[in-house]
């Protein structure tokens, strides 16, 4: 008998999470056999595990969007009177599309 407990499911690796994200972009909600395709793309996870992972992701997004998850207090990084945003802006100027 399968359990819905998170502890009975093996942890997701960084690579599996990335493959999951990519598969969600490829197989949208209208794709036939979406969860089978996503599970196959991820590898090492069942259709049920993939669905549960998606449900947790949606739940997390809802909690963030409704303000139930507090934003971290980021410290301003300054070096030579330039903030991190200045650094990012300089990097973006060299970006070629």
UniProtKB/Swiss-Prot annotation:
SUPFAM superfamilies: Homeodomain-like. Residues 7-59 form the SANT domain. Expressed in the micropylar endosperm surrounding globular-stage embryos but no expression was detected elsewhere, including floral tissues. It is found in: Nucleus. One of its GO terms (cellular component) is nucleus. Pfam families: Myb_DNA-binding. Keywords: Nucleus, Transcription, Transcription regulation. Signal peptide: none annotated. SMART domains: SANT (SM00717). GO terms for biological process: regulation of DNA-templated transcription. InterPro entries: Homeodomain-like_sf (IPR009057), RADIALIS-like (IPR044636), SANT/Myb (IPR001005). GO terms for molecular function: DNA-binding transcription factor activity. Assigned as a member of the MYB-related gene family, I-box-binding-like subfamily. Probable transcription factor. This is Protein RADIALIS-like 6.
């Amino acid at each position: 008998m399968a359990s819905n407990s998170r502890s009975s499911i093996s942890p997701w690796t960084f690579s599996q999470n990335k493959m999951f994200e990519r598969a969600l972009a490829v197989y949208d909600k209208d794709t036939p056999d979406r969860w089978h395709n996503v599970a196959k793309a991820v590898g090492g996870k069942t259709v049920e595990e993939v669905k549960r992972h998606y449900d947790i992701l949606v739940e997390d997004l809802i909690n963030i969007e409704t303000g139930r998850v507090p934003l971290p207090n980021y410290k301003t990084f300054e070096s030579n009177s330039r903030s991190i945003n200045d650094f990012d802006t300089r990097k973006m100027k060299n970006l070629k599309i």
